[in-house]
Regions:
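Glycine-rich phosphate- or other oxyanion-binding loops that anchor nucleotides, phosphorylated ligands
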Residues: 1-186
Length: 186
């Protein structure tokens, strides 16, 4: 188990460390943003494939089928493609355009890096993501500008941003609630 943190580079580094340990498979798991309007915070997505500007990576079908069958007996899950972005997909407009361009149902920032390493090393790949923010959610400025690569706020700047723009506080609490639902579903 390796906690990569947020973003392509962090995930790439973690996946390389795991392959050095001679693993035979990689799992990308964590939270994602919905770009399909039918998804809500807490929903589980099993990726059929990962899409990014560099390519299209399929997950391991038999592994995906077994996990999907098991999880379906516990709760409803969604199967579809996940687009992996190097930048945060911050607004509902960005999410809409990404959905239209890719037909994916969710967006994350790590799975393509893990998929690249799995593909390069002929490793099985499974991608499990839970939804933290729905397609209509816009990520507040304090979160975008004042959190580290583990999602933790840089307190002083975060608080100053909230004081400068207090309207975002409600959105921060809504995002936190969705994130908590996503983590609980994992």
């Amino acid at each position: 188990l390796c906690l990569s943190g947020i973003g392509h580079e962090s995930a790439l580094f973690a996946a390389k460390k795991l392959t050095a340990l001679k693993v035979n498979a990689l799992i990308s798991w964590g939270v994602a943003g919905a770009i399909d309007k039918s998804l809500s915070s807490g929903d589980i997505v099993l990726a059929n494939s990962i899409i990014n500007e560099g390519g299209h990576y399929s997950t391991t079908r038999d592994w995906l089928s077994r996990v999907s069958e098991h999880l379906q007996s516990i709760r409803s899950i969604y199967n579809g493609d996940i687009v992996s972005s190097k930048e945060i997909c911050a607004s509902s407009t960005d999410k809409f355009h990404l959905s239209q361009r890719t037909d994916a149902i969710a967006v994350d920032m790590e799975s393509a890096a893990i998929a690249e390493i799995a593909s390069a090393n002929n490793l099985d790949l499974l991608v499990i993501r839970t939804i933290s923010d729905d397609a209509e959610t816009t990520i507040p400025e304090a979160v975008l500008k004042h959190t580290n690569n583990l999602g933790q706020p840089r307190i002083l700047n975060f608080m100053l941003s909230c004081m400068t723009n207090p309207n975002q506080i409600r959105d921060i609490f809504a995002l936190k609630s969705g994130y908590k639902k996503g983590l609980t579903s994992l």
